[in-house]
């Protein structure tokens, strides 16, 4: 199946001034309304990681769950859930971080990873990088390492990919948008 970048990008809806004025939200729900586009996304990630040497897939609450869980299934990898504060029932590790919207906390079950584990992290997009950096900090606190951060969309003008790369976390995104791109 050929990856059609322009058609793919047309399925990501820009929503101006959401969730607050001045933000252009990249809505991926139309992408998931197209089985062909969804398959292209999943297949692209599966092909990237099928021969890679890592042990777990970490998914960010909530849109990272959509892609990462299917990729984990396809690659037969354990899934680690990184959730918003207060959503996990057992002992957790917590990490504060800044988003483009304000401060938040990311949590993970404290027994999710062990020393020597290696994790590909999945989210829907990389904006400021705050969520993925918080997840990387949690991964490292458990003695594991980050293999790569993966997302559907990169918003390079917000600096998240650069911040991740500066922290020696490689990134992989299927597409990118300029902030003013419609």
Curated annotation (Swiss-Prot):
UniProt key word Cytoplasm: yes
Keyword annotations from UniProtKB, A to Z: Cytoplasm, Glycosyltransferase, Purine salvage, Transferase
A molecular-function term among this protein's GO annotations: adenine phosphoribosyltransferase activity
Enzyme class: transferase
Pathway(s) served: Purine metabolism; AMP biosynthesis via salvage pathway; AMP from adenine: step 1/1
Top-level taxonomic group: Bacteria
Entry keyword annotation includes Glycosyltransferase: yes
Localisation per UniProt entry: Cytoplasm
GO cellular component: cytosol
EC numbers, comma separated: 2.4.2.7
GO biological process: adenine salvage; AMP salvage; purine ribonucleoside salvage
Reaction catalyzed: AMP + diphosphate = 5-phospho-alpha-D-ribose 1-diphosphate + adenine
PROSITE patterns: PUR_PYR_PR_TRANSFER
Role, per record: Catalyzes a salvage reaction resulting in the formation of AMP, that is energically less costly than de novo synthesis.
Oligomeric form and interacting partners: Homodimer.
HAMAP family given in the database record: Aden_phosphoribosyltr
Family: Belongs to the purine/pyrimidine phosphoribosyltransferase family.
PANTHER family assigned to the protein according to its UniProt record, in alphabetical order: ADENINE PHOSPHORIBOSYLTRANSFERASE (PTHR11776), PHOSPHORIBOSYLTRANSFERASE DOMAIN-CONTAINING PROTEIN (PTHR11776:SF7)
The name this protein goes by in its record: Adenine phosphoribosyltransferase
Underlying gene: apt
């Amino acid at each position: 199946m050929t990856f059609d970048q322009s058609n793919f990008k047309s399925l990501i809806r820009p929503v101006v001034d959401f969730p607050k004025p001045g933000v252009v939200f990249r809505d991926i729900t139309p992408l998931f309304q197209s089985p062909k586009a969804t398959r292209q996304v999943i297949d692209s990630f599966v092909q990237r990681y099928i021969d890679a040497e890592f042990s777990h897939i970490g998914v960010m609450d909530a849109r990272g769950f959509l892609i990462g869980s299917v990729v984990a299934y396809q690659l037969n990898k354990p899934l680690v859930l990184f959730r918003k504060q207060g959503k996990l029932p057992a002992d957790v590790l917590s990490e504060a971080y800044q988003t483009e919207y304000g401060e938040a906390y990311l949590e993970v079950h404290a027994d999710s990873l062990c020393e020597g584990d290696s994790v590909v992290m999945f989210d829907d997009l990389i904006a400021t990088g705050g969520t993925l950096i918080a997840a990387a900090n949690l991964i490292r606190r458990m003695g594991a390492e980050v293999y790569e951060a993966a997302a559907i969309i990169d918003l390079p003008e917000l600096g998240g990919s650069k911040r991740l790369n500066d922290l020696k976390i490689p990134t992989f995104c299927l597409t990118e948008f300029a902030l003013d791109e419609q």
